[in-house]
Design a protein with these regions (language model features):
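Active-site anion-handling motifs in enzyme catalytic cores
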Residues: 1-316
C-alpha cells in the first residue's frame, strides 16, 4: 500500500509546515502529500496509508477522508472553530472512527471529545517531538530568538515601546525577531519544507527561544533548545483546550508581566480605549538569560513511543 502524509497546502503558518515535515521525516519519502482540507476529494486511484496528524480543520464539511485512505490518527487536535466539533463528533461518524481507533491526540481535550462519543482515544503528544537536532552543542550560537513573542498580548504599536522595559539591556544585541507566518497561500510544497527546515536549523543552534507559538516551542523542545513560552493572551476556552498536555513541556510566563492582556472586561476596555498605553508599566522579566533553564520534561520516552507507533503502522 502507498504511504502518505497530510499538509495544509494553503496555510500561512509555518507551524503547519513543521508538523507535516515531522511526518515526512518519519515516513521517509511518502508517495503522496495530501491536502489536509480536502482529504474527501482524493484523486488517487490506489489505497493509501495516511499519517494523519495536526490541527483539524478549516473546512470540516470536507470530513471524513475518502474511502481509499486508511488513516493513522496521531497527534490530532480538533478545533472548536468553524463548527468543526459538530461535524467531527456527529453520530454518523462513530462507525468510521471505530474502524481506526484508538485515536492519538496531541492534547487531553481532544482525547475527551472522542471518548465522549465512545471512541477509544489516548494522549500521544505531538509528532514534532520526534524532530532531532543534527548539530552539536559547539554549533550553538548566542542568538536569543523572539518568535512571534508578543503577538497575543501587545498591540503592534506598543511592542517596540515596551520591549525595552521587559528585557535587560545586556541581552538586547543578541535578540533576533522571527515571524512564524507568511503571506503566500500558493507557496509550493518544496518551498514550504525548505523554509521549515531553515527554521528548524536556526532553532537547533539558538541559545534560547522566546515564543507564543506552540509549534515553535514544541520543535525546540525536541531539538534540546531552551524555551520560554509566553502563555499570555490565550484566555478563550478554545485556546486553553489546545494547551492541555502541551505547555508542561516548557517554561512559561503568565499575565504577571502583561496586565490588561486578556479578554476580561478590564483588559478589553483598557486596550480598546488605549488606556493601556498610559497604565501599562512593563517590568523587566526575571529570567536567567545568560544560562536559561533546561526544558522541564525529558521527552526521550515519548519520542521513542511516537516513532514506534508510526513505524508499526507503516509496516502493518
Amino acid at each position: 500500500m502507498k504511504k502518505g502524509i497530510v499538509l495544509h497546502k494553503s496555510s500561512l503558518n509555518y507551524g503547519d509546515d513543521i508538523q507535516s515535515l515531522a511526518a515526512y521525516k518519519l515516513v521517509g519519502r511518502p508517495d503522496y502529500i495530501l491536502d489536509r482540507e480536502n482529504l474527501h476529494l482524493s484523486d488517487v486511484n490506489e489505497n493509501i496509508q495516511l499519517l494523519c496528524n495536526g490541527w483539524y480543520m478549516e473546512n470540516p464539511q470536507n470530513w471524513p477522508p475518502a474511502e481509499n485512505i486508511y488513516p493513522f490518527f496521531i497527534s490530532l487536535h480538533v478545533t472548536h472553530n468553524n463548527n468543526t466539533i459538530d461535524f467531527f463528533f456527529s453520530k454518523k461518524l462513530i462507525d468510521y472512527y471505530k474502524r481506526f481507533e484508538p485515536i492519538g491526540c496531541r492534547d487531553y481535550h481532544t482525547v475527551r471529545l472522542f471518548r465522549k462519543i465512545g471512541i477509544k482515544a489516548y494522549y500521544s503528544g505531538c509528532l514534532t517531538l520526534t524532530l532531532e537536532n543534527k548539530f552539536n552543542e559547539k554549533d550553538r550560537t548566542d542568538e536569543i530568538l523572539f518568535v512571534d513573542a508578543f503577538n497575543k498580548n501587545l498591540p503592534v504599536e506598543l511592542r517596540t515601546k515596551y520591549f525595552n522595559q521587559l528585557v535587560p539591556p545586556t541581552i538586547r544585541d543578541k535578540i533576533k525577531f522571527i515571524n512564524h507566518s507568511h503571506s503566500n497561500p500558493n507557496m509550493s510544497i518544496e518551498e514550504r519544507f525548505k523554509n521549515a527546515e531553515l527554521l528548524i536549523e536556526r532553532y537547533s543552534k539558538a541559545h534560547l527561544v522566546v515564543t507564543s507559538r506552540i509549534h515553535c516551542a514544541l520543535p525546540c523542545v525536541a531539538l534540546g533548545t531552551p524555551v520560554l513560552f509566553l502563555d499570555v493572551g490565550f484566555n478563550t476556552k478554545k485556546s486553553r483546550n489546545r494547551f492541555e498536555g502541551v505547555t508542561n513541556y516548557f517554561n512559561t510566563l503568565n499575565n504577571n508581566y502583561f496586565p490588561y492582556s486578556g479578554i476580561d472586561p478590564v483588559g478589553l476596555i483598557f486596550r480598546r480605549t488605549e488606556l493601556y498605553k498610559y497604565y501599562f508599566k512593563g517590568k523587566e522579566i526575571k529570567y536567567n538569560w545568560e544560562s536559561p533553564p533546561q526544558n522541564p520534561v525529558n521527552i526521550g520516552g515519548l519520542r521513542k513511543e511516537l516513532k514506534s507507533k508510526v513505524s508499526n503502522f507503516l509496516n502493518s
